[in-house]
A protein has these predicted regions:
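Short, charged/polar N-terminal "headpieces" of proteins
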Residues: 1-61, 128-132
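Flexible, active-site-adjacent loop/turn segments at secondary-structure boundaries
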Residues: 1-4, 87-89, 98
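Exposed, low-complexity/repetitive linear segments and helix-based recognition motifs
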Residues: 2, 8, 26-27, 42, ...
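Generic structural signal of hydrophobic/aromatic residues within well-ordered alpha-helices
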Residues: 3, 46-57, 78, 82, ...
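Short, flexible coil/linker elements and helix-boundary hinge sites characteristic
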Residues: 23, 31, 63-65, 86, ...
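Intrinsic-disorder-associated interaction segments
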Residues: 35, 39-42, 47, 67, ...
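Negatively charged, Asp/Glu-rich surface segments that serve as flexible interaction/assembly modules
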Residues: 49-89, 93-94
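C-terminal charged interaction modules
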Residues: 91-132
Length: 132
């Protein structure tokens, strides 16, 4: 047994977007599958984003008597993390294939809220890379 056999082979997760009611794969106008690719939680890119967000929160809490974290702040940090760890996408939104930016990713994940859950589930499923 080689320990390298028990490590992931890629630092990305490609999530095929499915219709929220029928679970059918969604297609773009060109016939390609709609996909969103994100960095995996063990990747250096993902860790850099999480560390930056945590460091920002730690710095903001320094010197304060309370380090309370509101639900709104938690939700915003989660959205920021997802937007910044989205590597690429192949989606149709608003009749076009939008350029991936952090702001556009936040917009898509907010407006088409069920996609966020699919991406999060895809990442969670990818962590089972060692299963037989």
């Amino acid at each position: 047994m080689d320990l390298m056999d028990l490590t992931p082979k890629t630092d990305i997760v490609v999530v095929a977007i499915k219709h929220p009611s029928t679970n059918e794969p969604l297609k773009n106008d060109d016939g390609s599958d709609m996909t969103i690719t994100v960095y995996a939680p063990y990747s250096k890119e993902y860790k850099a984003v999480v560390h930056a967000i945590a460091n920002k929160r730690i710095k903001a809490a320094q010197g304060k008597k309370s380090a309370d974290y509101t639900m709104e702040e938690l939700e915003a940090a989660t959205m920021e993390s997802l937007a910044k760890t989205t590597k690429e996408w192949n989606i149709t939104y608003g009749g076009e294939v939008p350029k991936l930016t952090e702001a556009k990713a936040k917009e898509v994940y907010d407006k088409v809220f069920w996609i966020k859950a699919q991406v999060e589930q895809g990442v969670e499923d990818s962590l089972g890379f060692m299963k037989a």
